[in-house]
Amino acid sequence: MDVAKEKELREAEALMEKNVLLTSIDKVLNWGRGHSFWPVTFGLACCAIEMMAAGGPRVDISRFGYEVFRASPRHADVMIVAGTCTRKMAPLLRMIYDQMPEPKWVIAMGSCASAGGPFADSYSMLTGVDKIVPVDVYIPGCPPRPESLVYGLLQLQHKVNHPDKVRLLKHGK
């Protein structure tokens, strides 16, 4: 009787190995998050024009699942800071970031958002939005091409899908 039960159990395990996908729930959630970013619109200067062009038919970021730009930060999980950020705009940037639900990511698009750009020496400019919010991906250029934004989104997707290979920092700390 025990031999028959063991044989039946082995057959069930073999069948399960062929037909059942075993994974952790985090991997499944990260896969879903990485393939359906919902960016909040936060265009500040000329980089915002390139961000809008990325949604057009020539580049078409919707083929990657990123076409849903949200007007409300409560419905977004990615903030794309596109352009020059002044010191007066910094508290609003932080407020919008704080309104986004976890998990959330930030992309600094362009030289101005990354390091201040040509206005870095100005009294009213931030020398990078990473002084206000934690930035996950930097996209260089003045302004960067729409293809660069697609590349940055794909880098963020890789970062989300492989948190064990890429160190993700906990936001807000």
From Swiss-Prot:
UniProt-listed SUPFAM superfamilies: HydA/Nqo6-like
Question: Is-annotated flag, keyword Transmembrane?
Answer: no
Q: Does the keyword Iron apply?
A: yes
**Compartments where found:** Cell membrane
Q: Name one GO cellular component term.
A: plasma membrane
- The EC number(s) attached to this protein equal 7.1.1.-
> What biological processes does GO assign it?
aerobic respiration; electron transport coupled proton transport
Q: Which UniProt keywords apply?
A: 4Fe-4S, Cell membrane, Iron, Iron-sulfur, Membrane, Metal-binding, NAD, Quinone, Translocase, Transport
Which reaction is recorded as catalysed by this protein?
a quinone + NADH + 5 H(+)(in) = a quinol + NAD(+) + 4 H(+)(out)
Q: How does it sit in the membrane?
A: Peripheral membrane protein
Superkingdom, according to UniProt? Bacteria
Instruction: Give binding positions for [4Fe-4S] cluster.
Output: C46, C47, C112, C142
Q: Which cofactor does it need?
A: [4Fe-4S] cluster
Cofactor binding, note field: Binds 1 [4Fe-4S] cluster.
Which Gene Ontology molecular-function terms are recorded? 4 iron, 4 sulfur cluster binding; iron ion binding; NADH dehydrogenase (ubiquinone) activity; NADH:ubiquinone reductase (non-electrogenic) activity; quinone binding
| Binding partners and assembly | NDH-1 is composed of 14 different subunits. Subunits NuoB, C, D, E, F, and G constitute the peripheral sector of the complex.
> What PANTHER family is this protein classified in?
NADH DEHYDROGENASE, NADH DEHYDROGENASE [UBIQUINONE] IRON-SULFUR PROTEIN 7, MITOCHONDRIAL
Question: Which family does the UniProt entry place this protein in?
Answer: Belongs to the complex I 20 kDa subunit family.
Q: What is this protein called?
A: NADH-quinone oxidoreductase subunit B
Which organism does this sequence originate in?
Answer: Desulfitobacterium hafniense (strain Y51)
